[in-house]
Structures are given as structure tokens and as C-alpha cells.
From Swiss-Prot:
Species this protein is from: Vibrio cholerae serotype O1 (strain ATCC 39315 / El Tor Inaba N16961)
PANTHER family in alphabetical order: PYRIMIDINE/PURINE NUCLEOSIDE PHOSPHORYLASE, PYRIMIDINE_PURINE NUCLEOSIDE PHOSPHORYLASE
Protein name: Pyrimidine/purine nucleoside phosphorylase
Gene name as annotated: ppnP
A GO cellular-component term linked to this record: cytosol
InterPro entries hit by this protein: Ppnp, RmlC-like_jellyroll, RmlC_Cupin_sf
Taxonomic placement: Bacteria, Pseudomonadati, Pseudomonadota, Gammaproteobacteria, Vibrionales
Amino acid sequence: MIKENVYFDGNVKSLGFSQQDGESTVGVMAPGQYTFGTGAPERMTVVKGALTIKRVTDADWVTFTAGEAFEVAGNSSFDLQVEVATAYLCEFLPA
């Protein structure tokens, strides 16, 4: 089953799906600044565009571009700065 997710007044949209190796979402973020909370640990891969992020454990902002990935701990949060419309894959990791 495919689940549609809409955040931040429609500026972030994703489609959630399940496979044998777990849950994932694929989506697009419009330019803007966002803060996301996590339940499970996540791996975010930038498909096209760029995400500049700051996790709770980061001292500075870090930019990831197409083909690059980062992980965020479960029960945490991270801030995002998005300069151009960006596509991403989010994989939920085992706790």
C-alpha cells in the first residue's frame, strides 16, 4: 500500500511504501527551512538537488548533494535548509 504524506503546508510531500527490508518514503521538498522529528533511525539519500542539515549532534551545518546520504538517530530531530526543490529517499532503519 502507498501512503501519501504532506508536511509544512504542502511544501514537503512524500509517498510511503514497504518492502521486505523495511519502510521507506520518497519525496520532494520545496525551498525553505524545516525541522523534522524522528521516531526510528533514518537514512536520507538526496536523489536530486541538495539538503543542508544540522542534527542535534552537529556543531555546524552540512550540505549533502545528489547521491549522498546521511543518518539521523531515532527519537531525535534535525533542521533542514533547502535552497532548490530537492528529491529524497528516506529509509527507516532498525532501532
